[in-house]
Amino acid sequence: MTTIGNHMKFNVHRSLREQVRSFYIDVLQCTMIPSPAPNLELYLFPDKFVLGVFFCDESEVLSEEDHLKAAWLEIKTKDVQALKQRLVEFGVKEVEYADKSRFYFQAPGGQVFRLAPEDGGI
């Protein structure tokens, strides 16, 4: 059996640290856990998924446009409308996509996510 693990990392420009922190803690309600490095913040999702965000120089990060061509992730929630409202109020950039049944957006730093119901299938 093969599975995908519960850890992911990406690089974000160092100037976005406060915005990223607010996004993952205030909007997505993650918990920040201790990090082994000063340029790394670790965010724990309720399902025990750990996201590592490295704060880097411009030469080490993808542009928002490049993120549109990179891997997209999915965030599942019990209350899609409530989370979508928090995302919009925070100011995420909506991503236009053919699938209009879901809300696609870019987090601070450019990572693309799709918002889906927890029990909503594919």
Describe the role of every protein-language-model region.
Residues M1-T3, I33, K84-I122:
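Vicinal oxygen chelate
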Residues I4, D47-F49, K69-A71, S101:
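Residues that flank catalytic or metal-binding motifs in active/ligand-binding sites
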Residues S15-M32, R86-E89:
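Amphipathic alpha-helical segments
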Residues D66-K84:
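Mid-chain, well-packed structural core segment of small domains
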